[in-house]
């Protein structure tokens, strides 16, 4: 007679920073025979992305107030009650053994209803500064997990769940030692393109002598790739063997592992992935992030000499060119090793184990 599998409900939505770590845990639990159901917003990216991973969805409509008008704020009580009712119906249908909240607006009403109906709630905060939802729910959850130490009081530091292939990358010492010739630079703008990086990096490279100039792979998002090409051409740098411009990178593990240096924003998942792989990084935090959390994310590595932090207001072609002139593969390798030493490569397993334990089960092995 086959026993009924235990069920995990993942609550996450809105941005990749919430959704991708949730997917990492979901796949880990599925590999152990668990049934996984996702609770998200039908208007969020999760509604398109999660079903592609073979995970069924339940939906709750709820949004935030930040930057919204008076009408939205006045409608909050009604919208919250509606979201709570939708959450209650979803929980009754799914009957989860444990609920994992990974962030996003829907986590607030769904988390409240989870607790009020007596189901165990596990929370995970991805950023170095916790959002309001997790600050409230942390007082009600069975277990509270954080990616950065100190993000929430009395929480367990697990790190951020990442894709398995990133955690399995060859150690930086071996990778850097096997290379010779020009430095290899990876610039990651993400889907939004990071216009500041697209403008400054080509001009900085143009200030370097050809012998000093690294080989570059610059990712900028499909909407920005034409402008990026124009920026490189205006700087006198034609695309070719030493300059590759791409709209998207499918295999980030290989891209990180092939680079001596990464220049990028400092979202929570980016910082976690760079540390897990062990690669030198120059972080330029997005200046308009909520609570300036990208700065504190980057500081976690930068304060340990495991990365360099430059605020966007301070970034210039001259500053970047001068800094690049002072780097060697040896200095970048040392930075990469410090970064790897601060990583939590088993974060996915740890979060999954906590979920299983709260449900009264065990999780076997590692991913």
From Swiss-Prot:
Its EC number is 2.4.1.227. GO terms for molecular function: UDP-N-acetyl-D-glucosamine:N-acetylmuramoyl-L-alanyl-D-glutamyl-meso-2,6-diaminopimelyl-D-alanyl-D-alanine-diphosphoundecaprenol 4-beta-N-acetylglucosaminlytransferase activity; undecaprenyldiphospho-muramoylpentapeptide beta-N-acetylglucosaminyltransferase activity. UDP-N-acetyl-alpha-D-glucosamine binds at residues 15-17, 127, 163, 191, 249, 294. GO terms for cellular component: plasma membrane. It is a peripheral membrane protein. The keyword Cell wall biogenesis/degradation applies. Pfam families: Glyco_tran_28_C (PF04101), Glyco_transf_28 (PF03033). CDD domains: GT28_MurG (cd03785). It is found in: Cell inner membrane. Pathway: Cell wall biogenesis; peptidoglycan biosynthesis. One of its GO terms (biological process) is cell wall organization. Its main location: membrane. InterPro entries: GlcNAc_MurG, Glyco_trans_28_C, GlycoTrans_28_N. The keyword Transmembrane helix does not apply. Keywords: Cell cycle, Cell division, Cell inner membrane, Cell membrane, Cell shape, Cell wall biogenesis/degradation, Glycosyltransferase, Membrane, Peptidoglycan synthesis, Transferase. It catalyses: di-trans,octa-cis-undecaprenyl diphospho-N-acetyl-alpha-D-muramoyl-L-alanyl-D-glutamyl-meso-2,6-diaminopimeloyl-D-alanyl-D-alanine + UDP-N-acetyl-alpha-D-glucosamine = di-trans,octa-cis-undecaprenyl diphospho-[N-acetyl-alpha-D-glucosaminyl-(1->4)]-N-acetyl-alpha-D-muramoyl-L-alanyl-D-glutamyl-meso-2,6-diaminopimeloyl-D-alanyl-D-alanine + UDP + H(+). Cell wall formation. Catalyzes the transfer of a GlcNAc subunit on undecaprenyl-pyrophosphoryl-MurNAc-pentapeptide (lipid intermediate I) to form undecaprenyl-pyrophosphoryl-MurNAc-(pentapeptide)GlcNAc (lipid intermediate II). Belongs to the glycosyltransferase 28 family. MurG subfamily. This is UDP-N-acetylglucosamine--N-acetylmuramyl-(pentapeptide) pyrophosphoryl-undecaprenol N-acetylglucosamine transferase. The gene is murG.
